[in-house]
Amino acid sequence: MRFKLNDMEKKWILYDVGNSAFTLLIATIMPIYFNYLADQAGISEVNYLAYWGYATSAATIIVAVLGPVLGAASDTKGRRKKIFLVSLLIGALGCVFLGFTQSWIWFLLLFVIAKSAYSLSLVVYDSMLPDVTTDDRADQVSAQGYAWGYIGSCIPFILSLMLVLFYDKIGLTMKTAMGISFLLVAVWWIVMSLPLLKNLPAEALPVSSFRQQPGCQLPPSERSFFRTEKPTEKVLFFPDCLFLLY
């Protein structure tokens, strides 16, 4: 029997289609452009590869620290839509500015900001799944999100790749082609997010509302909020996990 998505599930999946374009950009075109900027600044290959690794690690640490806190806050304090929207806009605007900066240092800084915001938006996005679908459909909907995300992200990627490869034949410079490519991905990301933003499920009840209901225990997300300090401390200071930063 064919699995049929309902309207809200489709809108949830569309965000995966949008943000996956940014993921593909990070894995393909973005390192090439950073290589170009670093080479223009006279930085050796060894150094610019190291700097790229440091920037990626910095974004990972930021998400590891802020992810649990923002995730709990979005679930228990009625801020889900606000946190999701802010993360989305910071990530998309960072993507736009990445394409037009001519400084490798600013490029790395913007990369850390954009990638962190992108990852934090996913924390809130994933938490929406139980509100978008039922438990027995969650696995299928999540799988559809991954599948359509990869397929849909190919559209802006192919257009961006054509611009980067054949920029000289259409009268553009390398920097202009990159700027248009990054702008294209950011616009795609935002446009694919609009249906979900417009129909975002109702916010979770604030913490005080749970406490005011007789006999109502605090939800798991609130309990996790008060447990984020020690787990985060253990992750950051557990030596065996440091290899993940390389």
Predicted regions and their residues:
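Cytoplasmic membrane-interface "Motif A"-like loop-to-helix N-cap segments
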Residues: 74-88
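Glycine-rich segments within core transmembrane alpha-helices of 12-TM secondary carriers
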Residues: 140-164
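Cytoplasmic helix-loop-helix junction between adjacent transmembrane helices
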Residues: 110-148
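Juxtamembrane intracellular "pre-TM" segments in multi-pass secondary transporters
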Residues: 1-10, 200-238
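Helix-loop boundary and gating motifs at the non-cytosolic
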Residues: 2-60, 104, 108, 113, ...
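C-terminal ends and interior cores of transmembrane alpha-helices
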Residues: 64, 85-103
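Central cavity-lining transmembrane alpha-helices of secondary-active solute carriers
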Residues: 49-72, 154-157
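C-terminal membrane-cytosol helix-exit motif in multi-pass small-molecule transporters
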Residues: 156-168, 186-205
